[in-house]
Structures are given as structure tokens and as C-alpha cells.
Amino acid sequence: MSSEVSARRDAKKLVRSPSGLRMVPEHRAFGSPFGLEEPQWVPDKECRRCMQCDAKFDFLTRKHHCRRCGKCFCDRCCSQKVPLRRMCFVDPVRQCAECALVSLKEAEFYDKQLKVLLSGATFLVTFGNSEKPETMTCRLSNNQRYLFLDGDSHYEIEIVHISTVQILTEGFPPGGGNARATGMFLQYTVPGTEGVTQLKLTVVEDVTVGRRQAVAWLVAMHKAAKLLYESRDQ
């Protein structure tokens, strides 16, 4: 990939919407696959009462729109200002209690797990029915649109074309607890070709530090898949 193309993919611009300032991709086609579109606000003329507590709007009880769902609420039911990274807002924005809770949970992904995905981890990678795995570093691209696999060869998988993400586990530790993560199974399509391509990532067991990083990467990728499916269903 040329540096010029890479820079074009990552270019961003600051825009002002009715909800606040947003840092969005210069080219819409290069937006994050985890992003959400701004909702259509419920028209003011249809907002006579708070959609949570049913308080009637008047001179003293003002209406506010939740920036995530677009519904209208009174100040008491829509007072929290919470980061909303999936819509690219620069500053925390007003959200109803239900949406604020969801956005706070997503903030953990952006603050912690996204960094893990961008840093990458090393796996034994098996393509399709091949019996010979290749040691490769897997990481998410800076614009969050591609999964890069680098070893003796280089592959780019477009995130939006991933259809299946499954963590592979084995056994249970002594004394109970969660099953041990050993890898991940992915299915994805390649534009211009028929059928589904399969990919298996296996954790390298002989390096403790590398294993911890690899398992953290698997967990982060599983969370990313959930956000991806939500964005598709919007």
C-alpha cells in the first residue's frame, strides 16, 4: 500500500452537526466499520412529553434530544454528557440514561481494547485447509477498516467482509474459571470471488508474554466483532 493511499484512507476533517463537533473521515468510504450514523431526531412538534418519565414540556421543563437515540427527554432524564466515539464526537454529548450506559461500556473498547488491536499480536495462521501454519503478526489498521497479517507474506482482510468470529478454547483451569483461549476462527469473503475464505489463528504457547498479548488481542477482536454486527444492523 503506498503512503499516499494510506494517508488518503486516514485523512479526517472536523464538521459541526446539530449534536456537536465531529471528527469524521475525509472520505466517507474510509470510515470506521464500528461507527454509527447520527440518528434522526424526533421532531419538536411530536415531543410534547418526556419519553422516559412523561413530564410535560413547558417554559420551565425544557426538552433535550439524546444524541445517540434521537428521542426527546426532560433535563432530569437526559442530563449525562458521555463520550460517544462511535459517532466520532470530539466532546462528550448529552444522552439519555439508557444510551449513556451503553456508551460508557463501549468507551472501554475504545480506551483499552482498540489499542490492543492496533498494537497487534503474533499467531500461527492457517488459511483454509492448509496443513502448514505460518507465524504472522496480526493487527488492525489505523483507520480500523483492515486486518493486516504480516509474516513471510502479507494479507489484508477488510473488516466489513468478516462474517464469522469465534474464539477457540480448551479445558477448564483447576478450581474452576473460564476455559482457556487457544485461538480464533474467522470466515470472510473476498470481493470479486465466490465462496467464503476460512482463517484460523492459533496462540503461540512457548512465550508467556506473547501468549498474554495474543489472548488479549483475541478478546478485543471478539468485542470488535460485536460492534461490527451492531453497525451492520443499524
Swiss-Prot record:
<dbReference type="InterPro" id="IPR038632">
    <property type="entry name" value="ZFYVE21_C_sf"/>
</dbReference>
<dbReference type="InterPro" id="IPR011011">
    <property type="entry name" value="Znf_FYVE_PHD"/>
</dbReference>
<dbReference type="InterPro" id="IPR013083">
    <property type="entry name" value="Znf_RING/FYVE/PHD"/>
</dbReference>
<dbReference type="InterPro" id="IPR052113">
    <property type="entry name" value="FYVE-type_Zinc_Finger"/>
</dbReference>
<keyword id="KW-0967">Endosome</keyword>
<dbReference type="Pfam" id="PF01363">
    <property type="entry name" value="FYVE"/>
</dbReference>
<keyword id="KW-0965">Cell junction</keyword>
<dbReference type="InterPro" id="IPR000306">
    <property type="entry name" value="Znf_FYVE"/>
</dbReference>
<dbReference type="GO" id="GO:0005768">
    <property type="term" value="C:endosome"/>
</dbReference>
<protein>
    <recommendedName>
        <fullName>Zinc finger FYVE domain-containing protein 21</fullName>
    </recommendedName>
</protein>
<keyword id="KW-0863">Zinc-finger</keyword>
<feature type="binding site">
    <location>
        <position position="53"/>
    </location>
    <ligand>
        <name>Zn(2+) 1</name>
    </ligand>
</feature>
<feature type="binding site">
    <location>
        <position position="74"/>
    </location>
    <ligand>
        <name>Zn(2+) 1</name>
    </ligand>
</feature>
<keyword id="KW-0968">Cytoplasmic vesicle</keyword>
<keyword id="KW-0479">Metal-binding</keyword>
<comment type="function">
    <text>Plays a role in cell adhesion, and thereby in cell motility which requires repeated formation and disassembly of focal adhesions. Regulates microtubule-induced PTK2/FAK1 dephosphorylation, an event important for focal adhesion disassembly, as well as integrin beta-1/ITGB1 cell surface expression.</text>
</comment>
<dbReference type="InterPro" id="IPR032031">
    <property type="entry name" value="ZFYVE21_C"/>
</dbReference>
<feature type="binding site">
    <location>
        <position position="99"/>
    </location>
    <ligand>
        <name>Zn(2+) 2</name>
    </ligand>
</feature>
<feature type="zinc finger region" description="FYVE-type">
    <location>
        <begin position="44"/>
        <end position="104"/>
    </location>
</feature>
<feature type="binding site">
    <location>
        <position position="96"/>
    </location>
    <ligand>
        <name>Zn(2+) 2</name>
    </ligand>
</feature>
<dbReference type="Pfam" id="PF16696">
    <property type="entry name" value="ZFYVE21_C"/>
</dbReference>
<feature type="binding site">
    <location>
        <position position="50"/>
    </location>
    <ligand>
        <name>Zn(2+) 1</name>
    </ligand>
</feature>
<feature type="binding site">
    <location>
        <position position="66"/>
    </location>
    <ligand>
        <name>Zn(2+) 2</name>
    </ligand>
</feature>
<feature type="region of interest" description="PH-like">
    <location>
        <begin position="107"/>
        <end position="234"/>
    </location>
</feature>
<feature type="binding site">
    <location>
        <position position="69"/>
    </location>
    <ligand>
        <name>Zn(2+) 2</name>
    </ligand>
</feature>
<dbReference type="GO" id="GO:0008270">
    <property type="term" value="F:zinc ion binding"/>
</dbReference>
<dbReference type="InterPro" id="IPR017455">
    <property type="entry name" value="Znf_FYVE-rel"/>
</dbReference>
<feature type="binding site">
    <location>
        <position position="77"/>
    </location>
    <ligand>
        <name>Zn(2+) 1</name>
    </ligand>
</feature>
<comment type="subunit">
    <text>Interacts with PTK2/FAK1.</text>
</comment>
<dbReference type="GO" id="GO:0005925">
    <property type="term" value="C:focal adhesion"/>
</dbReference>
<keyword id="KW-0862">Zinc</keyword>
